[in-house]
C-alpha cells in the first residue's frame, strides 16, 4: 500500500531570510501609513504563501514564513488571503491560522484566483486597499494578474522576479533551442512575446566563425525592462 509522501518544509538561504525581514518591515510600514484612516480596509495577499514555516539553511532551525509574520503585523491588516498551489503547504498553513476568521486560504492557481475572484473585490472606490506579495516559485505568475492589480489603483505589489527559472527554462543563449513550454510560460509571465526584443540583441560582430546571430542580454537589463513595463 502506497503511503502519502512526507511533507518537508522549504529550505531558505540567507537572502531569502533577508527578503522575509524586508517584507515584514514593509507590511508594518504599509499599515502604519493608513493608521489614521479607519474607513480604509487593508488586506494582505500572499500569492505563493508556502506553509508558513521554512527551514533556515544557515542555522538548520525553523523560521517563520511571510504569512506567519504578516499575521503579527502591527497596526494589523483587516484581512489576509494566502494562496498556494501545493495542498500540503496550505494544509499546514491552516494549522497556523486556526481560529482566525480574518484569514482566507486558497489552494490552486494564483493567477486564476487573483483575476477571477479576489482582485475584482479590492475596489479603490469602496476604500479597499491591498498589499500583494508576489514571490513565485518560478514563472508561475501571469501578467494578467499583475496588470489587474496595477490598474486597480488599490494594490501595492511586492514582486520577486523569478530570474533563476527564467534562465533555466525560457531565456537561453540560443533562443532557437528553448522548448515551446518555456516560451509559453515566459509569454504568460511577460504578457506577450515582446520579451524577446529585450532579452536578445543582434550580435554586432556578425556571424563570424559560427558566432550566434543574437546575444543574450544580462538579467539586469531584462528585469529593468519588466519594471518599466509594470509602470
Task: State the predicted function of each range.
Residues 1-231:
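Class I S-adenosyl-L-methionine-dependent methyltransferase catalytic core
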